[in-house]
Amino acid sequence: MSHFLDFKIRIPHLAIFALFLLTGLLPGCGETALVPVIKPDNALLKNPELIALEPSENATKVKRNAKIVLSFNVPLDSLTLTVNAEDTQCSGTIQITSNNFLNCVRMNPLELKDNNKKIILTPKGIYATQKFHQIRLTAEIKNLNGVSLKKEITTNPGFKTTWSQQIGTPGDDSGMAVSVDPKGNIYLAGLTSANESGDKKDLFLAKYAPSGFLNWIQQAGFERSVTAAVLHQKKAGLINLRAYSQEKESSAVILAVYAVDGKKIFSKTIKLNGTAPGNGLTMDKDGHIYIPAATPFNVMKISKTGKIILGTELSPGLRIRALAADTENALYITGSIKQSLDRKKIKGGSDIFLLKISQHGLKRWSRTFGTALNESGTALAIHSDQAVAVAGYIPQAESAAEGDAGAQDAFVVKYNSAGKQQWTYIFKGKNSEQSTVVLWTPEGELLVGGYTESSLKEQHHAGKEDAFLAKFDSAGKLLWLRQFGTEENERPLGLALGREGQIFVTGFTEGQMDGAKFSGGRDIFLVQFDKDGVKQ
């Protein structure tokens, strides 16, 4: 019997297929097969890198509600992207802080764009005022293939927000007067809604630190609407607040004194009969105040204790808009008039007038000017008893030529103390504008604020009524002009100078000034410029 050995060679199928691929031979065919080589996606193996950042590193004057845009080189895994949305704990993989990560800004849920390469962030509220804000990206951030950042990223110093402040209620509020003490603290007074419905009004006083931090705000409790207010700081550290209130068939003067901690020391309301034609209020160096008066008087003087000293009758046709007292207690008055003044005939409509009277009510001199249409002085400022500036509005030249009471131009004119005109400047826009406030600097330069419905010289129009601020030298040369605002209406009503020449502007806005929080109706704004017109 023969025995045959049965050798069985077992070759795995994959090995045979691999051999087939290596030889490149197909049975019955002499051609070589081309086999594609699959390469890994190197993009998914790359570490995520931050390639662009908005606002940029070291950016300044960033709006307080600005969005943050982070752009990366590769798509990111959304599951690794988190922010602290519920509290101020620095807990997410993306963190924003203004105090070295002791706590972080609450953020809205993030938004992804550009195939997950771009992250859009917005704050739930607003950023802190005039602070550097750093951004931290932790190493837990990954791309779609699970590859992390090489290391944690922290911007330094980050971006810096604006100084601008905004406060208000759901009703209509307005800043009217502002003052700065020797330490740089800012005091702000004006009108606010006294109840939720907004139908009751009251006077308020607020104190800000130089950094913009709101130290306190007090509602005076007079429960009256006010049309003008002034602030004066005593050497003893007390703040004098004076306001003029006009309501139907009734007007009143409000006197109050506050300590620097916000405590009310003294207050008094002096009720007057009738309603005066016009508004305005000023305080002389002795603390006495002057206001428009009801018939038969035009101006009333009230002592610092609230006693009525005298009433002065000037002309029955005066509508007073502004008053200012010099260091000798002489009084300047401006506004509009519809009849002759001191035998000076008006040109038509209502003309602008400027009067100077002594502290005893005796008239020194008067000036009138205007067109066939309506115009008015709205603001006054005195410089060292040597010059007086009058600001207001006049009809645009085209409107005056056609006899059409349409658009208006803002103006400012300088007189010397004897009533001689020195120079005039007219702000020209396509639509209406008015000057509303003026202030001299100690160096004799003049600041003029107002509002415009269009773009002034080389300026951008944000929308509706924008605020503007201009600075002139003593000869009337325009040094700079700035236009600012929101898409809604703004009007500046008060100016003050800081200890280093800063310029503080207050008034009202119906939008978000530099990204600040909007409460509704009209809000109070407070913004700061340096002496060269750079907004802070």
Regions found by a protein language model. Give the residues of each.
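Acidic, low-complexity Ser/Thr/Gly/Pro-rich repeat segments typical of extracellular/periplasmic
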Residues: E31-T161
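Ala/Thr-enriched low-complexity intrinsically disordered regions
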Residues: A15-A18, T23
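Intrinsically disordered, low-complexity segments
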Residues: S2, L76, G146-L149, K301, ...
